[in-house]
Regions:
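Domain-scale signature associated with acetyltransferase and cell-envelope carbohydrate enzymes
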Residues: 1-105, 111-112, 122-123, 132-142, ...
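Short glycine/proline- and charge-enriched loop/turn segments
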Residues: 117-128
Length: 151
């Protein structure tokens, strides 16, 4: 069951979510203007160390960081203390389990080349710049992603 307060937060962030969304603890969710986050039916998101005894290091974090970025979480997905951070797009298929403390990042947060990094420092858009490379991630249906993995 999702609290009324979290429903208000999701609505304010323009996040679409399906039936029976179960939030255990309070996730960090940020949906950049012009981007989208969609959560399917029967999804469970665990965000407190007591909600999964594997030893969660942090709350679940779901972020779109650039315009037109998209995160799509399918039906029946379970997430525990993971970070899902998109500049382009991340799709998680139906009935997939994301283990405790996983990091799913479609970008490296900064360019590898020093010259391009220096350009980014003077870019007025900063972290929103196209200078930060990103590639879409697609995780299929019925997958099991073990704990403490980085994509």
């Amino acid at each position: 069951m999702t609290s009324n307060w979290m429903k208000i937060v999701l609505k304010a962030q323009k996040i679409k979510y399906g039936k029976n969304l179960l939030l255990k603890g309070v996730p960090v969710i940020f949906n950049k203007k012009g981007s989208s986050i969609e959560i399917g039916d029967n999804v469970t998101i665990k965000s407190s160390f007591l909600s999964n005894l594997v030893g969660l290091y942090s709350r679940t974090i779901i972020v779109t960081r650039a315009e037109n970025a998209r995160i799509l979480i399918g039906n029946g997905v379970g997430i525990s203390g993971a970070t899902i951070y998109a500049r382009k797009g991340i799709t998680i298929g139906d009935n997939t389990c994301i283990g405790g403390n996983c990091k799913i990042l479609d970008n490296d947060f900064h360019p590898i080349e020093a010259e391009t990094r220096n350009k980014l420092l003077s870019d007025p858009h900063g972290g929103d710049s196209d200078l930060v490379p990103a590639k879409e991630i697609h995780i299929g249906k019925d997958c099991f992603i073990g704990a403490i993995l980085l994509f």
